[in-house]
Amino acid sequence: MILSVRSIAATCAVGALGAALAACGSPASPDAAHRGHRAPATTATIATTSPPPTLAPGPAGLTPVFKNAPRTRAKTVALTFDADMTADQGARAAAGEHFDNPQLIATLQKFKVPATVFMTGRWADEYPREAKDIGQDPLFEIGNHSYSHYAFTDDCYGLPTMSEDRMRADVERAYAAFRQAGVRDAMPYFRFPGGCYDQRSLRALSASGVTAVQWDVVSGDAFATDADAVAQQVLDGVRSGSVVVMHCTRSAAPATEQALRTIIPELRHRGFRFVKVSQLIAAAGGRH
């Protein structure tokens, strides 16, 4: 659950935003999977793919933090969705509470909007088929939102606090849950639960090789019931290179799907192109 930004200063490598970004609004982005018929050949060919772009480590080797891409004329924006479920919410799911939002995913597909979903491992355990479907759709990419959705700092919106010696293992456990669900290519991107991090948590994850992904636009969709207000807050905040944080949990963000029906056409009308976080990181000087 994300309510506001809480972070320390972190160094992010940024570069010129330009032709590295592919056309958006369709699965024809550079990291989409394209499969066609292979013409007959007399020699064997081997398909290779580049690893996802990541930022270089921060000062003293700390986990790098990405917030937004350079402000250029490219007018790109990445919509991100946190698939929240904490480790102790299984009983609530069993009682009928919905932590997924298939209609939101369907709306993104209908409008052909690429997006990055930051998923908890517990969510993938609860909804393995949906996790796999999202991971297999070339419109989307899956980032890590921890397994437990416990806080990586003290005093983070009432979330239970995780000890430093468990942090890296919790992130690795989430990736294991994704693989168990059938997600083959989860990205090396991590979003801290609650958006809360400090030197200690950045140090704890430094060996994991992830890039921490924050945001510069808060949608305010958590527990919101006014879709128009959510849409307006996003539209007021988006600039070129923005990362928008939203949620795809029906119980905790019931207005988000409806808000998207306003946000998507309006941003396109303003000349924005939707991209995934990986594309913004690549444009910001991310290394492969």
Regions found by a protein language model. Give the residues of each.
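N-terminal pre-catalytic segment of deacetylase/amide-hydrolase enzymes
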Residues: 2-99, 131, 262-263, 269-288
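Active-site beta->alpha N-cap acidic-glycine motif
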Residues: 47, 51-144, 148-159, 173-186
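Structural recognition of the beta-strand scaffold that forms the well-ordered cores
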Residues: 77-80, 115-119, 141-144, 188-192, ...
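Accessory recognition modules or surfaces
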Residues: 135-141, 169, 225-227, 234-247, ...
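Generic structural signal for well-ordered alpha-helices
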Residues: 101, 105, 131-132, 168-175, ...
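Acidic-and-aromatic substrate-binding clefts and catalytic sites of carbohydrate-active enzymes
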Residues: 87, 94-96, 119-128, 191-198, ...
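His/Asp/Glu-enriched short active-site or ligand-binding loop at hydrolase and phosphoryl-transfer sites
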Residues: 197, 201-237, 272-283
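Catalytic grooves of carbohydrate-active enzymes
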Residues: 239-278
